């Protein structure tokens, strides 16, 4: 049995696809070949994963017959869907859909720029952008279920594993 690699440099990932969809759904582009650095984070104490990518935006996205840089063509402002497929250093295929959280231009010149993008799950992004503005009475487990389904609108395909409140004085 071989030892698993638990930490790896970005160069060791084989990026198969990094397809970014614009928020209006009209434009999409695979920026996988533009990525210079990729940092993939999984944490035992975090309910979600996080990916940071750094890419050279060189005007390779065609929109309306004109080549534009990816940030402008996709109108990247946050919450864009990103379909990511890669193979990690342990030869495990990772296929995940994430959403853009932070888009930071690091360096910009005429027709080219260096951009840092932070990706996270839809729930983690919605968690920071949504507030609960109503009072809740009753069992804590019922509150969690209500917040996840009604306020955060967690996908119905995901199984909610919520431990029921065992003691509650009515």
What do these predicted ranges mean?
Residues 1-131:
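Assembly/oligomerization scaffold segments
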Residues 111-170:
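Charged- and aromatic-enriched interaction segments used to assemble
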């Amino acid at each position: 049995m071989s030892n698993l690699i638990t930490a790896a440099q970005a160069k060791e990932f084989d990026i198969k696809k990094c397809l970014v969809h614009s928020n209006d759904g009209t434009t999409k582009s695979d920026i996988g070949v533009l990525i210079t650095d990729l940092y993939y984070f999984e944490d035992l104490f975090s309910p979600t994963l996080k990916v940071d990518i750094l890419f050279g935006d060189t005007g390779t996205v065609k929109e309306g017959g004109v080549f534009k840089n990816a940030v402008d063509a996709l109108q990247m402002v946050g919450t864009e869907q990103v379909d990511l497929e890669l193979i990690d250093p342990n030869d495990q295929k990772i296929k995940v859909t994430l959403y853009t959280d932070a888009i930071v231009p690091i360096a910009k010149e005429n027709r080219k720029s260096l951009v840092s993008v932070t990706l996270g799950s839809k729930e983690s992004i919605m968690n920071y952008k949504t507030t609960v503005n109503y009072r809740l009475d009753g069992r804590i487990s019922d509150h969690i279920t209500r917040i996840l389904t009604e306020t955060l609108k967690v996908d119905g395909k995901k199984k909610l594993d919520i431990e029921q409140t065992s003691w509650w004085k009515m």
